[in-house]
Amino acid sequence: MTTVDLGTVFKGSPSGRLIETKGGSRTLRANDVVIDIAYSGVCGTDLHYRKADMVLGHEGVGVVSQVGPDVKAVKVGDRVGWGYNHKSCGHCNECWDGFDTLCPERTMYGVADLDIGSFGDRAVIDADYVHKIPDAIDLRH
């Protein structure tokens, strides 16, 4: 199993000020991708969590630097982005109806994966929840 160092991250704090700190590490699962973060959007949702002990940011883009053995849709070097949801079960009624944000088993920003955010060096995200960015689009946009 491969362990991924998340590098430097920016977390919320009780005062609401961002805290720069060392992120933890993650074990790369079979369908995970490691993203070296290039840019992050700032969303109003980030303001809701600024006093939480969690890595902030859920509108990230970057370059894939590692992939798990089951990943087929993206490869190392691909430019990708991700958002609020990190995973869902895929078999409940909500998922089947296209509402994976309502999945009772979902992992998403602010609820789970509190060590993963786009305000940092690296993120580990399930490959099914990243989106390729065409080369013609600058990552800053």
Language-model segment annotations:
Residues 43:
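Conserved Rossmann-like nucleotide-cofactor binding loop
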Residues 9-18:
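Extracellular beta-rich ligand/substrate-recognition surface
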Residues 2-10, 33:
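Short structural boundary motif marking the start of a folded domain
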Residues 13, 24-25, 52-57, 111-115, ...:
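Short Gly/Pro-enriched turn/cap motifs at secondary-structure boundaries
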Residues 89-141:
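NAD(P)H dinucleotide-binding glycine-rich loop of Rossmann-like/cofactor-binding domains
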Residues 8-10, 65, 123, 131:
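Conserved hydrophobic/aromatic positions in well-ordered beta-strands
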Residues 1-4, 18, 115-116:
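Short solvent-exposed loop/turn micro-motifs enriched in small/polar/acidic residues
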Residues 26-40, 48-93, 129-137:
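Glycine-rich beta-strand-centered segment in the early N-terminal region that forms part
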